[in-house]
Structures are given as structure tokens and as C-alpha cells.
């Protein structure tokens, strides 16, 4: 015998719940990877994407990095060169052209680099930031052109060049054209060195692969954010190759600092002050009594290196 339907519990109540269901944004809360603590998204964003309490440094967009660094959060975007899209007509599980389209829609950026010119602590500065959200910040032709354009801007305006590195390495979908960017960016760094302009690298989580093997490890000073993974091949690949367990914290910023590969591990909140001080010293900027930098003593121009 089939029992009569209970209209109150089976029909009316679900409809009432649906009618008055509160819309809750999916990203309202962020879970700390270290402690499991749940923190309001807005609170983390206002704290420059550092979890209050645990001080865990989350990934940060390129635009947010520039806003954090430049005085009053304002800067001039450096126009980046256009490059041929999908020159190899590459396809794996999906077409490379489709991957680019998805990444651009997701990030609102043409590729994985954003470069700005402005003032940091009163000093003119050129800053390049990699966007990990764009195909893991991988280095392709567009990225190589962007890095070189940033270096050229620093040379033209006689400013320090600061890089925030965040990348999974070379972009495999561009093959040899991607690998060619490693020597090209190295030449750009040599031009900065020949002109006696500081090149400071901030290694963020993660910085790996061909980016680590080229411009990310050619700085005059290497800073790193706490806990950042910095390597060529990741620890899992190395363990599978040598069949041995690696030390705790291997290839993390603190481990590399202890072994001389990183000059200093700097909390994100202290990066602007630290970089301003370093650039002031390297550019021979003298502080006025009010604490503001006076006009830097610029080095004499040096012809571009071949």
C-alpha cells in the first residue's frame, strides 16, 4: 500500500527553501593550506594575500603585485609587443590557440607578463610581474618579448629593473621558440649590467624550470618570499630519479637561503621597503632629511652589449 504524499514535507518545504535560499559566493572563504584555518576572502585580499595568523603567502596576481609596489598604487603600463599566435599550430588534448583564449578570458591579460613604470618609495622604477594564473606563468615568445621590453624601458629611463618571478617554466606548446627566450632574456640582463643598472629578482611560489635556468637567477640581488618553491626540476621528479628521500624543505626559499642560492627571504609586507632600500644603495641615491630620496647619481651611459 502506497502512503499518501505528505505535501508539507515533500513539496511545500523544499519550495520554501529554494525561494529563500541565500546566495553565498563560492570564494567567500579561503582555507589556509598550512593550518586549515578558514579566513574571509576580503580579509586575505586586504592583507596582500597573506593568511593572517599563519602568515602563509598565497599566490598573487601580477596586477596586485604592481599595485602593492608602486606609490599610491598607480603606474604606467608598458605596452608589450605582439607576437604570432600559435606559430607551430600545436595541439595536445586541445588546441594551443584554445588554451590561449581560455587563459586570456580567465586573467584579462594577453599573456603571462605585466610590466609597469612608476615610483616606488619615491624612486623611478620598472617592474615586471609574471601572472601564474596564465598557463602557469609559462615562458613563451610573448613572455620573452615582454621581459626584453621591460629591460629596454629600464635602460631608456635609467631605472632599476625589478622582476617578480612566478612560473612553471618554458611553454612546451611553443617548442624551440620558447627555449630561445632563455638566451634572449639573458642578453637583456647583460645589457642592464653593462649600463650599471640594478636588476633585482623576487622569487615567488613557484619559480621553476627554464625560468629558473635563465633570467630568474641572474639578478644582482635575489630575494624570495617565505615558503616559495624555487627549482629547476621539482622534488617529486628528483626523488623518482635518484630513488632517495629529499631533506625537509628541500628547494624551498629558506633552504636555499641557508645554502647561498638566495640572498634574503623577505615577508611580502616588507618587500617594498626592502627593494626601495636596495635600489637606493645600488643607484647611489642619497636620502634627504625628510627621508625622501634626492636625485640619484646616474651612471654614465654605456653602449649596449652585443
Curated annotation (Swiss-Prot):
What gene is this protein a product of? Answer: accD
Q: Where are the transmembrane segments?
A: none
The family line of this record is: Belongs to the AccD/PCCB family.
Q: Where is the CoA carboxyltransferase N-terminal domain?
A: 28-297
Q: In which pathway does this enzyme or protein participate?
A: Lipid metabolism; malonyl-CoA biosynthesis; malonyl-CoA from acetyl-CoA: step 1/1
Q: How does it assemble?
A: Acetyl-CoA carboxylase is a heterohexamer composed of biotin carboxyl carrier protein (AccB), biotin carboxylase (AccC) and two subunits each of ACCase subunit alpha (AccA) and ACCase subunit beta (AccD).
Region spans: Disordered: 287-306
Tell me the protein's name. Answer: Acetyl-coenzyme A carboxylase carboxyl transferase subunit beta
- List the EC numbers from the record: 2.1.3.15
Q: What does this protein do?
A: Component of the acetyl coenzyme A carboxylase (ACC) complex. Biotin carboxylase (BC) catalyzes the carboxylation of biotin on its carrier protein (BCCP) and then the CO(2) group is transferred by the transcarboxylase to acetyl-CoA to form malonyl-CoA.
Superkingdom to which the source organism belongs: Bacteria
Amino acid at each position: 500500500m502506497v502512503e499518501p504524499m505528505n505535501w508539507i514535507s515533500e513539496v511545500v518545504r523544499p519550495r520554501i527553501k529554494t525561494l529563500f535560499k541565500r546566495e553565498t559566493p563560492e570564494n567567500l572563504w579561503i582555507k589556509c593550506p598550512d593550518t586549515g584555518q578558514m579566513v574571509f576572502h576580503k580579509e586575505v585580499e586586504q592583507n596582500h594575500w597573506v593568511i593572517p595568523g599563519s602568515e602563509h603567502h598565497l599566490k598573487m596576481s601580477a596586477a596586485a603585485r604592481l599595485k602593492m609596489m608602486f606609490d599610491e598604487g598607480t603606474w604606467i603600463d608598458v605596452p608589450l609587443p605582439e607576437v604570432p599566435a600559435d606559430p607551430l599550430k600545436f595541439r595536445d588534448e586541445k588546441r594551443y590557440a584554445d588554451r590561449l583564449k581560455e587563459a586570456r578570458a580567465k586573467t584579462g591579460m594577453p599573456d603571462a607578463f605585466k610590466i609597469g613604470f612608476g615610483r616606488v618609495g619615491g624612486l623611478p622604477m620598472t617592474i615586471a610581474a609574471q601572472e601564474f594564473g596564465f598557463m602557469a606563468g609559462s615562458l613563451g615568445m610573448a613572455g620573452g618579448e615582454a621581459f626584453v621590453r621591460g629591460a629596454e624601458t629600464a635602460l631608456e629611463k635609467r631605472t632599476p629593473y625589478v622582476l617578480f618571478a612566478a612560473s612553471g617554466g618554458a611553454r612546451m606548446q611553443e617548442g624551440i621558440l620558447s627555449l630561445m627566450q632563455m638566451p634572449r632574456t639573458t642578453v637583456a640582463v647583460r645589457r642592464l649590467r653593462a649600463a650599471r643598472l640594478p636588476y633585482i629578482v623576487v622569487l615567488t611560489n613557484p619559480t621553476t624550470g627554464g625560468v629558473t635556468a635563465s633570467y630568474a637567477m641572474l639578478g644582482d640581488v635575489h630575494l624570495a618570499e617565505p615558503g616559495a618553491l624555487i627549482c629547476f626540476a621539482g622534488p617529486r621528479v628528483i626523488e623518482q630519479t635518484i630513488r632517495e628521500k629529499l631533506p625537509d624543505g628541500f628547494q624551498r626559499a629558506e633552504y636555499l637561503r641557508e645554502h647561498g642560492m638566495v640572498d634574503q627571504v623577505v615577508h611580502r609586507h616588507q618587500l617594498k621597503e626592502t627593494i626601495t632600500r636596495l635600489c637606493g644603495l645600488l643607484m647611489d641615491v642619497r636620502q634627504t632629511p625628510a627621508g625622501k630620496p634626492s636625485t640619484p647619481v646616474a651612471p654614465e651611459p654605456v653602449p649596449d652589449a652585443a
